Amino acid sequence: MTKADLLSLALDDFLTISSEVEAAAVVSADGLPMASALPPNVEEDRLAAMSAALLTLGERAASELGKGDLAQVFIEGPRGHVILMAAGPDSVLVAVTARGAKVGLVLFEMRRIAERVTAIMTAAVGESRGLAAVDDHGDPPAPEPAATSVASWQ
């Protein structure tokens, strides 16, 4: 599977698990769409560009106000929320929710999907260096069991 396929699969899983999420996308920090699951009335390029601009402003505000690294950008409107969360060093997970969404649950699932996106993006870089790739679900390979010596059992 390609990186784009794995990202799309992660977004599809996110929308399936989080029924209150109406749209989701992974965009580059430069504002380019990488994968999306959007309704017809949402333009992928426009969402990606706006998300990158919001992320840049959020990072700058957090830094200049001495609040550390940006964790997420949260926008609330009368009809729902737009939430942006870093997903690796150069990509952003975007979720658009319905009004009344259980934001805590959405954020919980976003963290899980952001970790998966990070693994996919890291594996894409690692593959070019001869490192292990992600599995067909976009998850990193399971770690090898630690070897134990007889002496450690005594």
Positions of predicted regions on the chain:
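Acidic, low-complexity cytosolic segments
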Residues: 1-21, 30-154
